[in-house]
């Protein structure tokens, strides 16, 4: 009888651990309030956004809250954060990714856009103006690349998981 009770308790413990893991609520915030002066981009009110959003996420039970802010939110910083998020999610998790930064259209490189333009998010290290041989958009986060990250995260979440992007 004692062994049976121990097995049941152990099984319930594992079920609680696994079900808790399967329902983690995660947030990745990308917030850029101050771009470098030489970039050509104006300041935003991303700090206000984040303080309000963070309180809301905490009230809604989000426990894994990550922030990639200002100087950390370079192209490399954002893509590293997206890869880290992708690797940490489990089936059934809820993930919210929020961007508070500039955006810009730019020439479509692979011909998949009917209007000939890609949409791009503007990381901290992206320049506003194209200049051949100097800055050709290599630090812009294009919609095609973002789509790849979101698709990979969505696959890892499985059918019960949720992915929100704002």
Language-model features and meaning:
Residues 36-51:
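Glycine- and acidic-residue-enriched helix-capping/strand-helix junction motifs
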Residues 51-65:
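Signal peptide-proximal N-terminal region
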Residues 7-19:
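Bacterial N-terminal signal peptides
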Residues 21-29:
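Cleaved targeting-peptide boundary
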Residues 22, 64, 75-100, 105-166:
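Caspase-like (clan CD) cysteine peptidase catalytic core
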Residues 28-39, 60-63, 131:
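Acidic/histidine-rich, surface-exposed loop or edge segments in extracytoplasmic proteins
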């Amino acid at each position: 009888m004692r062994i049976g009770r121990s097995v049941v308790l152990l099984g319930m413990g594992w079920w609680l651990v696994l079900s808790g893991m399967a329902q983690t609520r995660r947030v990745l915030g990308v917030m850029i309030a101050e771009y470098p002066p030489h970039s050509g981009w104006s300041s935003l009110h991303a700090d206000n956004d984040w303080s309000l959003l963070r309180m809301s996420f905490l009230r809604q039970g989000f426990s894994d809250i990550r922030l990639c802010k200002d100087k950390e939110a370079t192209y490399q910083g954002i893509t590293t954060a997206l890869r880290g998020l992708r690797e940490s999610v489990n089936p059934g998790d809820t993930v919210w990714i929020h961007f508070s930064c500039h955006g810009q259209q730019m020439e479509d490189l692979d011909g998949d856009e009917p209007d000939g333009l890609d949409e791009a998010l503007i990381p901290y290290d992206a320049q506003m103006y194209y200049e051949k041989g100097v800055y050709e958009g290599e630090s812009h986060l294009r919609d095609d690349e973002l789509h790849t990250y979101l698709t990979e995260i969505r696959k890892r979440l499985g059918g019960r998981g949720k992915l929100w992007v704002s």
